[in-house]
Each structure stands twice: as C-alpha cells, then as structure tokens.
Amino acid sequence: MKPVAAALLLLVAFGWQQPEPTPAPPKLFAIVFRTGPAWDTARPPGQQSFMKEHSQNLGALRKAEKIALGGRFGEFGLVVVRAADLAEARAMLLADPAVAQGVFQADVHPWSTIYEGCTSASAPPPR
C-alpha cells in the first residue's frame, strides 16, 4: 500500500502540474505624430521644446526593442511599436514628454501587416 501511496504522491507533485502559461505574442500599433498646440512655428523642429526628451524617449523604446520601425512622411511622424495591447501602446505614447506638453499630438492605431516578413511583431534577433 505504501508504494501505491508514494506513486500517487509523486503523480500529484510532478505529473499534474499545470504548464506555465506562455505570454501572448506582442502586437503592432502605429503611432502617428503631428504638431500640437505647443508647437512653435517660429522655430525649426530641432529647436522645439521637449524635442530632446522626445528623442530620448524614442531611444529608450528602441533599446527595449519596442519599436518595429519609425520615420517621417510629410508633416507627420510614424512609429510602429510592439505592445501587448492598445493600452500598453497608449502608455508608451503618453510617456513621451513632447506629447504630454502638447508639442506633438498623436494617435494610436492597431497595425496590420499585409506583407509578412517585412515587419514583425516579434523582437529582432540579438546582434
């Protein structure tokens, strides 16, 4: 009887453990920047208030591999970020000092990749 009890105890201890849930893969979100009410039209972009802090914020997101791509087009900026959900993507946006101070306004939209392999929600491989 003792061997059976020991075997059952081992089954309970090791055999019936629930596997660790795997986190959901990140999704992509497009953040579209445009000038805000605090944008000074008399100054060039590099001399705007909070531009240095804006660049530092984007640099930190790049270092954390949260940015999939980014650039400017016309009078707009576009940054595609990796996030678990829309709330996390919005939090990244709201953490930007230039947005918080009204130098930029921005919108967040879910990003749908059409051509697979061109942009990935997964972080790039280590260098």
What are these regions (language model features)?
Residues 3-23:
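Bacterial Sec-dependent signal peptides at the C-terminal "C-region" and cleavage site
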Residues 18-127:
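Conserved, structured core segments of small domains
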